[in-house]
Amino acid sequence: MARYNPRQERSLKRHSNYRDIKQSFLIICEGVNTEPDYFNAFRLTSASVKALGKGLNTIKLVQEAVIVRNEEQRKGHNFDQYWVVFDKDDFSNHDFNEAIRLAESNGFQVAYSNQAFEYWFLLHFNMYRGYIHRNDYEQMLSQQMKVKYSKKDYFTTKIYGMLLPYQPEAISRARKILAEFGNTPPSQAVSSTTVFKLVEELNRFI
């Protein structure tokens, strides 16, 4: 679940010279801290990541992502992969599904979570199926990690190493859960996440 932070953007670049790398990612995130900090923690050897936290949700985030992508291209920065990362939260089913459709129609891949990004973290520890309100995520994560979960700056960067040994299981669980929902619209697939797809892509370049 995204929270407003006066730091509206963070640009995270692995390399300054786009010509010297094999792959580049532009990741536009709903959350200002949690998601960008997490993706910044990936130690990529043959790719660059530019992750921006916008503090916007669903359709507005996708619209902003298109603007950012176009601005980057005008500067001569053409990325290999474009992603948006956002949550269902309490937004309407229509807005959530439409945001996914709009993103994909504009050339973005989508790493969504229903209900919130922290569900991806929970899957590192157990196979959590069914409805879990996002307000419970932080307490559940704190219990699992033996450290108080926080949305403050760089917290998810710090816990990346803690989560990493469990990442293969999280990917497997997220994929299995998503498959179980079949053709269920994303807005009704509670709980589920496609963050694992972005994680798998990033892992190709570690």
Residue ranges and their predicted role:
Residues 30-32:
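Helix N-cap/beta->alpha junction signal
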Residues 50, 54-72:
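A broadly used, surface-exposed interaction patch
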